[in-house]
C-alpha cells in the first residue's frame, strides 16, 4: 500500500507539473552558422515556472558518495547553497544513486541548460494523441503502470554534471532511463557540444532514441516527437535503447511485415495537431523558404539545410516569431485588437513567441575555444520578441542578485530580472506594433555591438588560457558577463518606465492612435451586443 501511495504521488507530481509546459527548441550545426558555433535553444514556455537562475558548482566527490534522485527537482527549491543545503521545494526525493568522482559546474533554472565543458541542451515536451484504439493502447502500455524515477529535470542535471560531450550526455541519460525508467511525459532534447548537435527523445519506460543532425543542418521541435527514422546500421549518427524496436513488435504496436517504416515518433508519441506542426513549418520555412513547405502538412523533414548562415540574432528572431508576413500573422488576428497585440493569451494559433515564456536560452558554443570560455549562453527572460539577451558562462564566479530574486506568485519587484522583463513585455501589449519597434530600436543596435565585443572577450580569454593564465581568463569573462547583465537590467528598467509613459492607455505620448483599418472593418461588422442582454 505504501509503495502504491508513493507511486501515485509521483504520477501526480509529474503530470500536474508538466501540464502547462509547451516549449519550442531549435538546433543548428556548426557549418550552418556564421561563426562556426553549434547553437541549441530553448523557449521555456510555462505559466508556473520558477524563473530563478543559479550556478551549480563543480566538485570532486569522495569514493562512495551518492546523489539524491528527485522528481520535479526544479519546482521552487532553493539551490543558492547547494549541495551544502538541500532545499528541493515542491520536488520529491525518491532515491539515491552513486555519484561520479567529479561533477561539472552548470546553470540551473526551471531547467538546467549548459555546463562548464560546453555541453548544452534544451527540451520540448511531447503531446500525445489518443484518438485511436491503437494509440490509447500505446499510451496505456507506456504510462499506465510506469514506476520510473527519471524525469527531464534530473536526467538533464545528471548529464550536465558528468558529460564533456553531447554524445556522452545522451548516453548518460539513456543509461539512467534503462536502469531506472522514464517517468515524465515524453521529451525531445537538443544537445550540443561545439562539434555536434544531437536530437534525443525519451518516450517513457526504458525507450529512447537519438540522432545526430548534419553539421550544415537546422532542426526544430515544438511539443511533439520528431525522430521518424533510425538507421540501425549507423552507430556513428544514431543511438537508441536496445528494445526500441522489439518493444513495438512484442506489444503489437508495429510489425516488420506492415510495410510501414519504423518510426519511433509515430509509434510511441503520435501527434499531428496544428499546435505543433505550424511552428515546425514556420521555423523550417524561415531558414529554407525555397522548399515551399505546406503549412498544413502532418509531417516535416527532421532537418533542413538553411539557405544562409545563421547568427545568434537570426536565431533570436526565430525564437520571437509570430508568423509575421503569413496568413497566420498573430498581429493581424481579431484577438490582436486594434494595435496588433501578438501576445494576447487567447490567440487561436500557437506561435513560437509566446506571452508566457519564462526564459529564452541560446547556447552558442565554439569548439575552437577552450572549455572555460566556449560554454557561452545568451539568456533572457520573457517572450523573445520583447526581451534582451545577455552573455553568461557557467564558469562565472557569481551571478547578479536579480537572477535569483522574486517569484511569479509574489508581488512585482523592480530588483527581479524576470519581473523587469515582464514589465516591458506587458507594457508593449497596450500598443504592440508601435511599441515593439521601439523595443527593437533600443535593443538590436546594442546587441549588434555586444555580439562583437563578446567574441573579442572570448578570444582574449582564450589567449590568456593558452599562456597559462586560466584564473585571469575566468576573471575576465566573469566581470564582463556580470557588468553587462547589470547594465542591461538597469537600462531595461529605465526603458520600461519610458515605454509605460509613452503608451499609457494605448495612446502614444498622450495622443490617441487610430486603430488598424482591418480592425475597424471587423468592428463595423460586429454586433453591438454580441452576448444577448438578459
PLM features: what roles do these ranges have?
Residues 2-9:
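Sec-dependent signal peptide recognition
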Residues 15-22:
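Sec/Tat signal peptide C-region and signal peptidase I cleavage site
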Residues 23-152, 172-306:
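A contiguous strand-loop segment
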Residues 156-162:
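Short, well-ordered beta-strand elements within core beta-sheets of diverse protein domains
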Residues 169-178, 316-319, 474:
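Short, well-structured alpha-helical segments that form the helix of a local strand-helix-strand
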Residues 246-376, 380:
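Glycine-rich, aromatic-lined ligand/substrate-binding cores of catalytic
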Residues 339-470:
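Substrate-recognition/cap regions that form aromatic- and gly/pro-loop-enriched pockets
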Residues 444-534:
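Histidine-centered catalytic/metal-binding microenvironments
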Amino acid at each position: 500500500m505504501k509503495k502504491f501511495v508513493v507511486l501515485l504521488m509521483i504520477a501526480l507530481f509529474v503530470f500536474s507539473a508538466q501540464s502547462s509546459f509547451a516549449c519550442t527548441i531549435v538546433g543548428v550545426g556548426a557549418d550552418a552558422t556564421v561563426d562556426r558555433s553549434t547553437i541549441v535553444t530553448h523557449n521555456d514556455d510555462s505559466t508556473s515556472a520558477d524563473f530563478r537562475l543559479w550556478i551549480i558548482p563543480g566538485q570532486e566527490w569522495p569514493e562512495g558518495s551518492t546523489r539524491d534522485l528527485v522528481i520535479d527537482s526544479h519546482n521552487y527549491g532553493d539551490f543558492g547553497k547547494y549541495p551544502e543545503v538541500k532545499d528541493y521545494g515542491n520536488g520529491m526525493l525518491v532515491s539515491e544513486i552513486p555519484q561520479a568522482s567529479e561533477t561539472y559546474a552548470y546553470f540551473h533554472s526551471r531547467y538546467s541548460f549548459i555546463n562548464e565543458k560546453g555541453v548544452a541542451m534544451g527540451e520540448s515536451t511531447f503531446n500525445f494523441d489518443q484518438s485511436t484504439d491503437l494509440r490509447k493502447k500505446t499510451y496505456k502500455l507506456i504510462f499506465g503502470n510506469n514506476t520510473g524515477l527519471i524525469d527531464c529535470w534530473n536526467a538533464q542535471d545528471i548529464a550536465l554534471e558528468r558529460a564533456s560531450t553531447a554524445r556522452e550526455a545522451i548516453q548518460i541519460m539513456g543509461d539512467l532511463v534503462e536502469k531506472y525508467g522514464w517517468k515524465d511525459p515524453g521529451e525531445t532534447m537538443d544537445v550540443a557540444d561545439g562539434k555536434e548537435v544531437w536530437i534525443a527523445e525519451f518516450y517513457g519506460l526504458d525507450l529512447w532514441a537519438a540522432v545526430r543532425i548534419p553539421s550544415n543542418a537546422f532542426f526544430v521541435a515544438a511539443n511533439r516527437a520528431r525522430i521518424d527514422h533510425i538507421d540501425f546500421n549507423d552507430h556513428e549518427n544514431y543511438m537508441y535503447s536496445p528494445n526500441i524496436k522489439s518493444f513495438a513488435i512484442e506489444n503489437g504496436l508495429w510489425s516488420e511485415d506492415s510495410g510501414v517504416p519504423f518510426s519511433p515518433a509515430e509509434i510511441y508519441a503520435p501527434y499531428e495537431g496544428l499546435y505543433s506542426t505550424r511552428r515546425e513549418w514556420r521555423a523550417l520555412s524561415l531558414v529554407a523558404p525555397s522548399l515551399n513547405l505546406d503549412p498544413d502538412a502532418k509531417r516535416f523533414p527532421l532537418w533542413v539545410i538553411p539557405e544562409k548562415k545563421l547568427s545568434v540574432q537570426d536565431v533570436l528572431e526565430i525564437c520571437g516569431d509570430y508568423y509575421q508576413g503569413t496568413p497566420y500573422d498573430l498581429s493581424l488576428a481579431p484577438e490582436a485588437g486594434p494595435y496588433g497585440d501578438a501576445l494576447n493569451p487567447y490567440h487561436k494559433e500557437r506561435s513560437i513567441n509566446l506571452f508566457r515564456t519564462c526564459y529564452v536560452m541560446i547556447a552558442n558554443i565554439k569548439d575552437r575555444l577552450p572549455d572555460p570560455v566556449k560554454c557561452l549562453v545568451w539568456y533572457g527572460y520573457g517572450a523573445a520578441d520583447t526581451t534582451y539577451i545577455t552573455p553568461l558562462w557557467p564558469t562565472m564566479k557569481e551571478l547578479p542578485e536579480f537572477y535569483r530574486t522574486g517569484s511569479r506568485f509574489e508581488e512585482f519587484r523592480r530588483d527581479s530580472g524576470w519581473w523587469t522583463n515582464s514589465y516591458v513585455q506587458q507594457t508593449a501589449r497596450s500598443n504592440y506594433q508601435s511599441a515593439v519597434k521601439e523595443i527593437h530600436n533600443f535593443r538590436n543596435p546594442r546587441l549588434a555591438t555586444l555580439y562583437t565585443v563578446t567574441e573579442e572577450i572570448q578570444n582574449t580569454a582564450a589567449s590568456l588560457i593558452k599562456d597559462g593564465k586560466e584564473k585571469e581568463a575566468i576573471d575576465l569573462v566573469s566581470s564582463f558577463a556580470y557588468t553587462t547583465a547589470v547594465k542591461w537590467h538597469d537600462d531595461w528598467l529605465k526603458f520600461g518606465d519610458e515605454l509605460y509613459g509613452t503608451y499609457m492607455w494605448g495612446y502614444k505620448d498622450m495622443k490617441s492612435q487610430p486603430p488598424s483599418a482591418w480592425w475597424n472593418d471587423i468592428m463595423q461588422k460586429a454586433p453591438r451586443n454580441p452576448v444577448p442582454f438578459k
